């Protein structure tokens, strides 16, 4: 069962995220979801700012120094933290979104409606990018496919945001009890003992 608290703050949301990292069952409240997304966004901005500073310094050094002095593979080492951070958070973000969707009464598999069009957009987009870089011929079919999947992806993205923002189903649903409701297990146990 997912552990959650009624009055959640950013620190509690981060703790719950890591505690429930592999937990795709149960429910996550809106505050649990959005507080963690805010903290994820803040860390991403900090990492991105550091990478921007290093990128600017590297480009500046390349302009005024010998660009061949450092091997290219080592020159951009500072881009690794953002990739590592993104990949390290991926499963946890999927499980958190699944629990948030389940809190609303939707299956966590709804995420595929957002992921699949994104992948299907990326395939023709990379084909177009490759033809531009290599000087190959333009493929109008790839452009049409990228446009169609981009529009579908935008629509499913908006739908996901709406689902993630809507209030939870009250009390219980098939994924468990509303995490914002007070825990009545102790109250029920005490009342049973009094009878």
For the regions a language model picked out, list residue spans one by one:
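Single-residue recognition of alpha-helix boundary sites
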Residues: 40-43, 114, 129, 187
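Selective recognition of hydrophobic, aromatic-rich stretches within alpha-helical transmembrane segments
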Residues: 4-12, 69-95, 104, 109-110, ...
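Membrane-interface extramembranous regions at the lipid-water interface
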Residues: 1-40, 93-109, 161-195
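Membrane-helix interface segments in multi-pass membrane proteins
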Residues: 44-86, 117-156
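Central hydrophobic cores of alpha-helical transmembrane segments
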Residues: 109-119
